[in-house]
Amino acid sequence: MSDNDKPKLGMRAPLGIKRTVETSKVKQSFSHGRSNTVIVETKRRRVINKPGSGDAATAAETAKKQAEPVENTPNKDTAVTQTATKNETVATPAAAPAPAPAAAPKPVAAEATAQETSKAAPAAAQPVAEKEAAAPASAEAAKSAAIKVTDRGAKKTTEKNGANASGNRPSGNRSQDNRGRQGGRGSQNKNQTRSGGQPRQPRTLAHRDLASRQELQARLLREAEESRLQALEEARRREDRLKQEADLEEQRRIEEKRRLEAEAKVEAEKQAALKEKEKAEAKARAKAEKEAKAAQAKTAGAAEGEEKTRRPAKAAAPKAREERSESPRSPAPRRFTPVSPPRREAPRPAMRDRKGEDRRQSGKLTVTKALSGDEGGARARSLAALRRAREKDKRANQNRAQQVRQIRDVVVPEAITVQELANRMAERGADLVKALFKMGVAVTLTQTIDQDTAELLVTEFGHNIKRVSESDVEIDSSSDVDPEETLKSRPPVVTIMGHVDHGKTSLLDALRGSDVVRGEAGGITQHIGAYQVESPSGEKITLLDTPGHEAFSEMRARGANVTDIVIIVVAADDGLRPQTVEAIDHARAADVPIIIAINKMDKPEANPQRIREALLQYNVQVEAMGGDVQDVEISAAKKTGLDELIEKILLQAEMLELKANPDRAAEGTVVEAKLDRGRGPVATILVRRGTLKVGDIFVVGEFSGRVRAMTDAQGKNQKEAGPSMPVEVLGLSGVPQAGDTLTVVESEARAREVAAYRAEIALRKRTTAQPASLESMFSALKDKQAVEYPLLIKADTQGSVEAIAGALNKISNEDIRVRILHQGVGGITESDVSLAAASGAPIIGFHVRPNSKARDIARRDGVALKFYDVIYDLIDEIKAAMAGKLGPEYFETVVGKAEIREVFSAGKHGRAAGLLVLEGYIRQKLRARVLRNDVIIYNGSIASLRRFKDDVPEVRAGLECGITLEGSTDIKAGDIVETFEVEERARTL
């Protein structure tokens, strides 16, 4: 029974991946004449051709192979093997990368192919252990599957052959039944058998079985390859997962290690601190025990010495001591020994009778024991006595420690509070107050004492004093002189001075090639400007332009102090004016050379010779008049004579040998300072020596700062400024005074210290009262009687503020004086308006304006805001306002004088006076006063005027008349009557 004929247990065929098996019958003939019909499995042969090859070639090759006669039976295995190898090569080119051997002795070709596949698989495996294990496993599985299929096919073939041998069925029917399936193959086999006389070997069946096995083997190899690739992919994924897990584990382990290290460190610190604490406690405890033992030993030694002096020396003392040791219960004299329990012998086994003993007397000192000298037992010292001894030693040690006092060096300034001095001495403040009270000075801890009193205290407490002065903080630049080898030539600083409208700024414009006059309000200079120009020869000259108005005398003085050469501009058509003379005085006070520039020579009325002669009145002698002062005739408008002027400036600078050290910390002078709304405080600095750089820390006046930016006269940013170079500096903490010195320091702390000291000195000067004198008392009384005119001044620059304040103070007199509540640089703010509203003062704004909020507050509170651009207008209006506050002036003019000759009654009018007019005239309703012995006894007016009995309006000199006075009858003969008129005039200052 074949596999297909076996009975099925189930109703349905089992599911599987096997295809339906097709069978056919083949007649097998043997050499001895017998034949056998064999049922074989029929499979269609599939030939896989290479691309480009046709089906005809394949069919011809197949027919040729089938037509070859089978010569020998022993070569069947070899042929089958070769065919299998060739078909395998064609069918599965991807499964066998290595070429198969030409002949294999084994009957199954799948085994060789599986072995080759298994050999190739490990070569492609990865070096990972899992991948190496997966590849051989897949190869072994493929090999075993191929062997099983081969064995199963061989077994089926054997069973079929046996069935055919026992059946004896005719082969023709089988061949005819399978003719439709076999096609021409059955006929061909049949014809071959008939024509040949010999039985033909079933090569076609072997080829079909071999093809089916090859297909199965190829499929299994493909599945094995897919399994191997899948296993490799899974191994790679597993390796990546394990690697990630290992990284995470490593990171967790590192974090855990760090945490444990931190905890261990904290624990170690705690343990160390605990050990230190325990060590300190043990040390203190050991020290206390050592002191206690020392005290006990000292007390015991003293007690033993006392006992030896009291007790007589006996030869039998050792014997008595032995007896006392044998009987410790006997009474013994009192001994001062350290606290320790008395030694006792070991308890005896037998208890003796104690009825006769007096235990209450044991260990007590009696007269009998003391006289007999019995020292049978040592008396222990009480705890109270030991405690008292310890306290005594402790007090002695404390007194000894107090006697050792640390001597300190105490720095004492000119003024210091008691508490601060106590802190520096490390003493209690109460002790210093007690010491001062003993000296007769009653102060508290917060009061200030002078340096001499502080020195007495420091000396009394045993310390050393170190006297310092507050001025030590100040920077002393006078002693800082640069060595001669470090000096280098620098440009000259030239100041242009002169009267108003004489052409100073026009000359500067001609030298600079700019137009500064057009930017000034009213065409006059009201600020001091600093510029630097370059001569045609390439040498630089620094120019300072000063105002010519009389209010700016302080600016002119500052300009003369920081300059090297002064150019005094005199208009040839106007001559010498007051400010011209003042400029000459400033230049002489500063001891700088003068160059006279006679300007406006282009006008027809110019007379330079008259200018030279007028200068002789002020001891200015030009070279043309035999002197040493240079003079130049120029015209700033026509730009004539400028080259000669520059030449003389450079000649004068060469004679002066101007030098400075550029390689040092910078020092400069504030030429002008202002508060810019966008940039903050800005100062124009003229560097005198050193180099000022961006980032330098400096002190200027009462303020400190750091150079944030520097710009020159053209508005270009500069990184550094050398000697004689004017720059605008940003970065100040406040607006300094014009003329203050700028000094670069090493640190911000030093800058703040110096600035704080200068601010304190300035505040002290403002608040310190002047010593009282008779003159100052009368002056203060006069000031109180005078009317005050309060106001606030805000200007764009510090120099303008000073000029306005000085000019307003000059117009004050004994009747009214200006009281400046506040003066500052910058715009008008809300705080300025609030201060003015509280005092009822107007606010003067010079080149500044208020912000919108300040304007609203001023409108609400009724504060007057006055704005000016020209200082002339400001001074004139303030004068008029001050005069208006005083009111008009009244002037008396005596128009008549008469003498009373007779007094008579006038009825209801009282008393009338008969007069003789001596001077002038007397009119009715004129104001009159009565003088008696040159003392005014009446001041009023004339009620009525009569001549004889008629009322007259006027009586002139030489005539007689009668008058009555309003509200007065105290008149006598001989009194003088004066009549006068009062004229009201507007007050002027």
From Swiss-Prot:
Cell location: Cytoplasm
Ranges annotated as biased composition (Polar residues): 72-87, 160-171
Binding of GTP, residues: 498-505, 545-549, 599-602
Region (G1): 498-505
GO molecular function terms listed in the Swiss-Prot or TrEMBL record: GTP binding; GTPase activity; translation initiation factor activity
Annotated segments matching region G2: 523-527
Name this protein carries in UniProt: Translation initiation factor IF-2
